[in-house]
């Protein structure tokens, strides 16, 4: 018979006899889930029994109290009493109560463990620890290793993680679990110190295995930025004669590791024997040479677009001249082709002052990566040459930095000498411009090198307190010390930002602090808080960029909340715009959510917020072709405010870079819109500037580069690309900084090189999809019927009406007398083509995997969307040393028949070394003063 009331049992609890009370508790425990509402009235009496140390069944009383609180929904109290029940609480019991308590216990433990991490004395209840560990053991016993590892990572229990991994009997299983932990550690673990400890532990486990996953080890090295670990890895690979994998990892490090790590690694390996080729690869010279060769050989530069822009935008106006200079630089980025500059010396001569500085620096983008001949190319414009203009001298030093960006070992000494020699005269106008270029140049060349020598040299320029050179010196320091978080440097920058009277320097220092805290996540919180609360607008502006860079790619909820709050509450428009822009950086890895988050902001009454929305979408979705982002941006291209239209057009070009008309139908419309804005005399200057720069971006690198923000093989952010974008967005204040976008350009190619000689063989691999989908968009052509339009406009309206009436009455299709047969034929062909294009269903352009394939030649254009359809047949002569998983860049190949002859592709450097001397660089005539 079921019990319908607990009253008799509750009455027994008031008896003096402990045996009777125990009986009552046992009975209540069996019915408490049904009668909890009645029993809860006497909860204080049951709690008193638990607190009575003389009562033998006090733990049972705790269990009953726990069940009452569970039914009341008071889970924290329920867990507390369940822990007090000790052995009476059976975690193996199959009930909703036990499942809930265990789940709540784990959550409580994780919360307490994360709060107490790093503290000497833990404040966690031992019973809570016991339940947590018993549940983990239960997972391990059941073979649920990933679940156990996930919980251990969330609770910062490194000991549990290492125990699970080291107790695996099978190395393949261990490697799978290590990969899981590595991905989780680099993407979800938010505590930097714990993340570092995990990665070091994983390195130690991996390096001791009989058959380690060396590529996983390289990922750990990049995340830790530790050259000593890298040296250990290469020593092991060389000692095992595993040179093919060593070369592949070296190429990977060149594109993903910091310059500081590479410099230290080269210095270490240079002392050993048999490391010459590794040292050469790690210098970055082969990679840059390969990319220059690809970009030069495959360039599809649409010069008619540039000429159209040049003729539509009067070079006498600095704004327009700068726009065409930047657009030209982007279109030719890395191709080493400066024919447009040579052919338009008279137009270049129109440049005045800082437009001349920008135009000279643009040569650095065109020759970017030319590490062997870069200085020789810029020589005619460098200080000490015949160039008379201070803007040419300063621009050439900036251009030198752009050529050697991230690989500046050979040029840093020269740039440092220029700074040291001139820093004492920083207040002189001529020297000020020169130091401005030199400071930006050395910052680029020494990016992330953490060089104290560069810092000390730039500090002298900064403290001279001259606006132009001081602001550039601040940025140079930030770039050099990128991501270091150096406390001494940070203190110097923050203190001087409050002392200087120059707004430009304050803003430069604020951005430098953001660069200093790149990737530091919660370690930057104190700096962010201090800057956000500052009364100076420039410091708050720097604060949101510090959030952007410190939390770049983390999708941190806290960071997003802070930015959204600033975006709607700050009193300064610049800060609000920057705050919305910063959302794009934080959400790089979660880019699909950005359109939804900023959609309402894109309709804000404040044009600066709308502008920030455009930049946020451009940053997060760069190179992705995301339709949702395009849908938000399209209305902004018709915004009534000119700078909003400017930002929208630039953002669209960043999103649609390397998209074809078949992979994204918007490409044609956007290109046409950009041309129309540039040609329209009634458009405001800022909108035309944006359209011209956007045209350069969408056609960048001879249509052979994209903006790639992640290193797919390493699972890390592409630091150069992220920093390039962050600095590019500063063009709002200073147009020369637009050149920084070139750091974000990644060549869209897969370059296979032979492992034994690093030469590029001519061979092909397979692409398993429909041929023609990824072809270059067609070149721009002037309308064929342009001349016909001129005739048509000359015809009187009365004549036209008479012809129309005559045509209607005859009801025939007679040819109009002012049009030839050839013209009619061309018009009909164009109309038929348009009708055919309109009839083509969208399904035809969907990219699908096919069992059939077409061949793609080595070192040719392979766009990001195409990579997943690329395959290297196993039975071919050349196969990758690492399993190909759809990544671009340099791939080391095994040659099955190395003794057989094969045709190889000569690189730009090899051509110059063997066939001809370096051509003499052209000089702009003195009478043009450029």
Curated annotation (Swiss-Prot):
The protein's matches in Pfam families, at most eight in alphabetical order, are given as:
HEAT_2, PC_rep, RPN2_C, RPN2_N
Note down the stretches annotated as region Disordered.
806-840, 911-930
Instruction: List the Gene3D superfamilies hit by this protein, alphabetically.
Output: Leucine-rich Repeat Variant
* This protein's record includes keyword Lipid biosynthesis: no
Q: Which GO terms describe its cellular component?
A: nucleus; proteasome regulatory particle, base subcomplex; proteasome storage granule
Mark the PC repeats by their residue spans.
358-391, 395-428, 437-471, 472-506, 508-541, 542-577, 578-610, 612-646, 647-684, 690-722
* InterPro entries associated with the record: 26S_Psome_Rpn2, ARM-like, ARM-type_fold, Proteasome/cyclosome_rpt, PSMD1_RPN2_N, RPN2_C
Identify the keywords attached in UniProt to this record, alphabetized.
Answer: Proteasome, Repeat
Q: What family does the Swiss-Prot or TrEMBL record give for this protein? A: Belongs to the proteasome subunit S1 family.
What role does this protein play? Acts as a regulatory subunit of the 26S proteasome which is involved in the ATP-dependent degradation of ubiquitinated proteins.
PANTHER family hit by this protein: 26S PROTEASOME NON-ATPASE REGULATORY SUBUNIT, 26S PROTEASOME NON-ATPASE REGULATORY SUBUNIT 1
**Protein name as it appears in the record:** 26S proteasome regulatory subunit RPN2
Q: Which organism is this entry from?
A: Eremothecium gossypii (strain ATCC 10895 / CBS 109.51 / FGSC 9923 / NRRL Y-1056) (Yeast)
């Amino acid at each position: 018979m079921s019990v319908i009331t607990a009253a008799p049992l509750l009455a027994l609890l008031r008896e003096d006899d402990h045996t009777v009370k125990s009986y009552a508790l046992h009975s209540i425990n069996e019915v408490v889930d049904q009668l909890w509402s009645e029993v809860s009235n006497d909860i204080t009496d049951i709690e008193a029994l638990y607190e009575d140390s003389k009562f033998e069944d006090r733990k049972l009383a705790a269990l009953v109290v726990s069940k009452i609180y569970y039914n009341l929904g008071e889970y924290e109290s329920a867990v507390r009493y369940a822990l007090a029940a000790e052995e009476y609480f059976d975690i193996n019991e199959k009930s909703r109560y036990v499942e809930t308590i265990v789940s709540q216990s784990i959550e409580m433990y994780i919360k307490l463990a994360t709060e107490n991490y790093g503290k000497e004395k833990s404040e966690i209840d031992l019973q809570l620890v016991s339940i947590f560990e018993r549940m983990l053991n239960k997972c391990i016993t059941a073979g649920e290793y990933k679940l156990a590892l996930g919980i251990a990572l969330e609770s910062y229990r490194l000991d549990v993680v290492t125990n699970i991994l080291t107790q695996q009997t099978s190395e393949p299983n261990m490697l799978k679990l290590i990969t899981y932990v590595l991905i989780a550690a680099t993407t979800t673990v938010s505590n930097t110190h714990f993340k570092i400890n995990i990665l070091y532990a994983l390195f130690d486990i991996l390096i001791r295995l009989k058959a380690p996953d060396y590529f996983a080890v390289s990922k750990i090295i990049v995340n830790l930025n530790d050259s000593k670990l890298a040296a250990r890895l290469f020593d092991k690979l060389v000692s095992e004669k595993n040179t093919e994998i060593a070369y592949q990892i070296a190429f990977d490090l060149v594109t993903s590791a910091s310059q500081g790590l590479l410099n230290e690694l080269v210095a270490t390996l240079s002392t050993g024997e048999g490391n010459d080729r590794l040292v050469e690869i790690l210098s970055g010279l082969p990679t840059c040479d390969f990319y220059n060769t690809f970009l030069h050989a495959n360039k599809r530069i649409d010069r008619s677009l540039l000429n159209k822009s040049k003729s539509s935008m009067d070079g006498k106006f600095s704004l327009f001249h700068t726009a065409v200079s930047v657009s030209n630089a982007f279109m030719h980025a890395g191709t080493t082709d400066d024919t447009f500059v040579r052919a338009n010396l008279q137009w270049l001569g129109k440049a005045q002052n800082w437009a001349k500085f920008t135009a000279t620096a643009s040569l650095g983008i065109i020759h970017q990566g030319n590490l062997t001949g870069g200085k020789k190319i810029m020589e005619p414009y460098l200080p000490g040459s015949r160039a008379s203009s201070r803007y040419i001298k300063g621009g050439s030093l900036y251009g030198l930095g752009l050529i050697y960006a991230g690989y500046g070992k050979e040029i840093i000494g020269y740039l440092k000498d220029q700074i040291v020699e001139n820093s004492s005269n920083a207040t002189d106008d001529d020297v000020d411009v020169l130091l401005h270029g030199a400071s930006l140049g050395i910052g680029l060349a020494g990016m992330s090198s953490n060089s104290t020598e560069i810092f000390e040299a730039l500090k002298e320029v900064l403290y001279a307190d001259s606006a132009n050179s001081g602001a550039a010196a601040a940025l140079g320091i930030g770039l050099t010390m990128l991501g270091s978080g150096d406390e001494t440097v940070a203190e110097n920058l923050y203190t001087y930002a409050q002392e200087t009277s120059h707004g430009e320097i304050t803003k430069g220092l604020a951005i430098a602090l953001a660069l200093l805290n790149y990737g530091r996540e919660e370690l930057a919180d104190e700096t962010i808080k201090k800057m956000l609360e500052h009364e100076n607008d420039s410091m708050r502006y720097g604060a949101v960029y510090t959030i952007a860079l410190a939390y770049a790619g983390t999708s941190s909820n806290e960071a997003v909340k802070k930015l959204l709050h600033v975006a709607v509450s700050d009193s300064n428009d610049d800060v609000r715009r920057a705050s919305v822009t910063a959302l794009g950086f934080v959400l790089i890895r979660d880019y699909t959510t950005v359109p939804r988050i900023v959609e309402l902001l894109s309709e804000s009454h404040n044009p600066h917020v709308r502008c920030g929305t455009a930049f946020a979408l451009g940053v997060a979705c760069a190179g992705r072709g995301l339709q949702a982002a395009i849908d938000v941006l399209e209305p902004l291209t018709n915004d009534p405010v000119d700078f909003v239209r400017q930002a929208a057009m630039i953002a669209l070009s960043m999103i649609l870079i390397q998209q074809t008309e078949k992979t994204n139908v918007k490409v044609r419309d956007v290109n046409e819109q950009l041309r129309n804005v540039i040609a329209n005399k009634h458009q405001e200057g800022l909108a035309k500037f944006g359209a011209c720069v956007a045209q350069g971006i969408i056609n960048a690198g001879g249509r052979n580069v994209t903006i790639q923000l992640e290193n797919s093989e390493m699972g890390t952010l592409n630091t150069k690309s992220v920093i390039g974008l962050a600095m590019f967005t500063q063009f709002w204040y200073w147009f020369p900084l637009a050149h920084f976008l070139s750091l974000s350009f990644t060549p869209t190619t897969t370059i296979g090189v032979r492992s034994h000689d690093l030469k590029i063989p001519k061979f092909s691999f397979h692409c398993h999809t429909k041929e023609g989908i990824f072809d270059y968009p067609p070149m721009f052509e002037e309308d064929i019927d342009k001349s016909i339009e001129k005739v048509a406009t000359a015809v009187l309206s009365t004549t036209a009406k008479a012809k129309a009436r005559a045509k209607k009455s005859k009801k025939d299709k007679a040819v109009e007398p002012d049009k030839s047969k050839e013209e009619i034929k061309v018009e009909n062909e164009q109309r038929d083509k348009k009708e055919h294009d309109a009839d083509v269903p969208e399904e035809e352009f969907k990219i699908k995997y096919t069992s059939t394939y077409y061949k793609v030649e080595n070192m040719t254009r392979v766009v990001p969307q195409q990579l997943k359809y690329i395959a290297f047949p196993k039975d071919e002569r050349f196969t990758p040393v690492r399993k190909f998983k759809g990544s671009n860049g340099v791939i080391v190949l095994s040659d099955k028949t190395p003794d057989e002859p094969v045709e190889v592709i000569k690189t730009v450097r090899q051509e110059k070394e063997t066939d001809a001397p370096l051509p003499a660089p052209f000089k702009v005539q003195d009478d043009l003063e450029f």
